[in-house]
């Protein structure tokens, strides 16, 4: 196994040697979705909120800094521990300048709903990638609630959210499954008169609903509909954040494809709205064992053991797509290593993530000798032998980490360009991957 080389901070490439196996017990960083929501609700609560397991990645730190800019006293993060002195729903102060949210689409969409109910104006901006992300899907239903939000002509950030608006509860049937849109409307609903209800066309992650309840705020669930009544109170609490299944996904796929691999991923969140990765890999023939199950802060957790398996291609059921939407870059690598054809449809959302993940992954797989045919809302991948080569992640952290795992079965080294954004979701990825058996280093 090659050591990690010390290089300058502006290095943008990973170089991964071929072969190897993943072995041992691993714990990936805390869940990104839950970390965002813990900061938001902790800031809006009355009293103190203590968080452990907080993900100290660039995206979640952007959310944390935004609330400091809004006058919230936050201690940490230090070793995943954060202490928030909540200011209550009406206690935020107007920021002195626009809030910079980096590459975090979660931050801008969730905070758009929150700031729609404030008495002051807020401008949300981000980096070049975030400035291309679509925001009308959240701004349009917020406008129906009475919000006044300006975007670019293309419906992208920066967002100028005008304060002093009176919000009214609505019932909104989402045209596309999106946990971010749902959560944004629920946050706006905290400030709305009456009842705010969101109806989902398919299940999405329910961390916001679970955490609102954990902070003492009543949440009603009726099948595909979730509702809250405005004007309540959040109470500070203790939040323990499990390991992120989206980060664990790379090691799950790596262990499934890497000959001789056998890993145990510890204390992973297995919220049933997030376990599509497990269901899909099992359908492909992966040997996955769930053990040491428990519940932490209202979220189910478990250890996940994955061993090298013989995978076969499948038609991925569309009802599993929302349950694995962030894990498809890793799953595309599994498909490339499987016998036969894997077909994905109904996943158009992948084209408007941090990158066009369908195209970026297809281009990379083709560069590595795999037949990968993009479609409007999915991809068709023919399993085969991965060659070495150079691929480009286009600044997408999940694509970069997925291609790194491909090296376990590649015939030659893989060079992955534009990897700086891996720090948005998985600080310490190289160190953990290297320790598990991946021959990965920084390069030029």
Curated annotation (Swiss-Prot):
Stored PROSITE patterns: EPSP_SYNTHASE_1, EPSP_SYNTHASE_2
Pathway this chain belongs to: Metabolic intermediate biosynthesis; chorismate biosynthesis; chorismate from D-erythrose 4-phosphate and phosphoenolpyruvate: step 6/7
Localization (cell): Cytoplasm
Primary residence: cytoplasm
Family matches, as InterPro entries: Enolpyruvate_Tfrase_dom, Enolpyruvate_Tfrase_sf, EPSP_synthase, EPSP_synthase_CS, RNA3'P_cycl/enolpyr_Trfase_a/b
Known role: Catalyzes the transfer of the enolpyruvyl moiety of phosphoenolpyruvate (PEP) to the 5-hydroxyl of shikimate-3-phosphate (S3P) to produce enolpyruvyl shikimate-3-phosphate and inorganic phosphate.
Designated name of the protein: 3-phosphoshikimate 1-carboxyvinyltransferase
Organism in which the protein naturally occurs: Nitrosococcus oceani (strain ATCC 19707 / BCRC 17464 / JCM 30415 / NCIMB 11848 / C-107)
């Amino acid at each position: 196994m090659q050591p990690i080389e010390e290089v300058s901070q502006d290095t943008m490439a990973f170089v991964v040697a071929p072969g190897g196996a993943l072995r041992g017990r691993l714990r990936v960083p805390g869940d990104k979705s839950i970390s965002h929501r813990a900061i938001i609700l902790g800031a809006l609560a009355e009293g103190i909120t203590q968080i452990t397991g907080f993900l100290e990645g660039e995206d979640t730190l952007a959310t944390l800094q935004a609330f400091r800019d809004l006058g919230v006293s936050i201690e940490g993060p230090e070793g995943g521990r954060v202490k928030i002195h909540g200011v209550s729903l009406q206690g935020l102060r107007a920021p002195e300048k626009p809030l910079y949210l980096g590459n975090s689409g979660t931050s801008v969409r969730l905070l758009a709903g929150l700031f729609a109910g404030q008495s002051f104006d807020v401008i949300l901006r981000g980096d070049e990638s975030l400035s291309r992300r679509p925001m009308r899907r959240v701004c349009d239903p917020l406008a129906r609630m009475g919000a006044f939000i300006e975007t670019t002509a293309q419906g992208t950030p920066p967002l100028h959210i005008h304060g002093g608006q009176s919000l009214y509860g609505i019932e909104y049937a989402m045209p596309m499954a999106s946990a971010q849109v749902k959560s944004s409307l629920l946050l706006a609903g905290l400030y709305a008169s009456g009842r705010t209800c969101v109806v989902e066309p398919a299940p999405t992650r329910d961390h916001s609903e679970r955490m609102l309840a954990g902070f003492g705020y009543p949440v009603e669930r009726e099948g595909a509909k979730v509702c809250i009544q405005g004007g309540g109170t959040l109470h500070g609490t203790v939040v323990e954040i499990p390991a992120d299944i989206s980060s664990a996904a790379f090691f799950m796929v790596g262990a499934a494809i890497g000959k001789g691999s056998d890993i145990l991923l510890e204390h992973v969140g297995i919220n049933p709205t997030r376990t599509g990765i497990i269901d899909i890999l099992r359908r492909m023939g992966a040997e996955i064992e769930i053990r040491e199950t428990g519940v932490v802060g209202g979220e189910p957790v478990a250890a996940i053991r994955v061993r090298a398996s013989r995978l076969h291609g499948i038609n991925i059921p569309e009802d599993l797509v929302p349950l694995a939407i962030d894990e498809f870059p890793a799953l595309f690598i599994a498909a490339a290593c499987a016998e036969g054809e894997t077909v994905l449809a109904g996943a158009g959302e992948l084209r408007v993530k941090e990158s066009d993940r369908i195209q970026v992954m297809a281009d990379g797989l083709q560069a590595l000798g795999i037949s990968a045919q993009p479609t409007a809302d999915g991809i068709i991948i023919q399993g085969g032998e991965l060659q070495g080569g150079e691929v480009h992640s286009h600044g997408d952290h999940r694509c970069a980490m997925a291609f790194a795992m491909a090296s376990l079965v590649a015939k030659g080294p893989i060079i992955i360009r534009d990897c700086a954004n891996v720090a948005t979701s998985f600080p310490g990825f190289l160190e953990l991957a290297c320790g598990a058996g991946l021959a990965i280093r920084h390069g030029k």
